[in-house]
């Protein structure tokens, strides 16, 4: 069977931990979109592993696959694999030959384009890792794919075609002399070719490349379980998110089919688990109607003074939850749980169950709020508008719940062990979304998650 893990919010919901939690019955774990811009943290036996490209299941000895929907920076991939090996692990990672490759010029252009956008206050808040420019080349039919790295002649043809275009973009559009760059070789045909060729040689030496769709179909035919792992979250999906403050791919469940080579019916007949953080976080610009205080340079109109109580609450949640970007280290904007956002995510993905993380972070507060609806143009709405401009005009309406105390979270083994007010909060969310809760996270380690149901249960 297949189980698809999808972030229901804006990323950073704790998907890696849930993949790890439910990973035992899975034989193969597949990343179906994104690149090394999406950090995820896995804790195994008290040891923390921070990864941005290698699938989470690799920490537990599962076969990891980077699907054709991913964009792959081989340098990052090799660095993470070598790091895991240095720590005594033996990751088995396969890379789709149809996946596109992030090359040095992509990273340079990503930073330049974001800087240009910032001058017009339209910066998206990218990580500068070349993700967007690589997907642009994919759509523009000028990309270099993993399979191209394995054929010297094809690779040379691809590089000779695309690199002069990138150099012209740099010099003629952005007005930057290539020799003024820290890495001018990023726009040199021979240098790019040699770098890419070295990537291909190592991929071939370690027998890492596969036709992902065929590979996964064969695994399923042999009776193996496949878990599909999305990066980021539904609300930054390029089609279903708050455009233009989105990523360049589809983290939603539909992307699991196109990004892996498995049929939509295969994905749809399996379980689709939505990962929810018990509060809301965001890195970068864009609407956040339930936001507490703000982050300068990210929250529109925020000047660093939202009032002592709200600032204190936002800082408390941010610090208790470690809400700083895994890749960038940037502070995340924080807010109360947003049900209009989750209703949209539930509809788009067809969640069969929810895993709610970080319930422990909210412990000790006198009250906990949930944004249950918005007011827009004098009317109450229950889901997010289709345009970002309208979403930015929404004012959140809140339901208030009594807070729950700090407890010994290590002693919370069953759902009934959770504080009563926390259960009330969770049951409200489940009822509003008409979706069962499969798991509740009360800490970072796998054994700090209360499992109500496994998606692999009959």
Segments the model singles out, each with a brief description of its role:
Residues 1-458:
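Non-transmembrane, aqueous-exposed alpha-helical and coiled segments at domain scale
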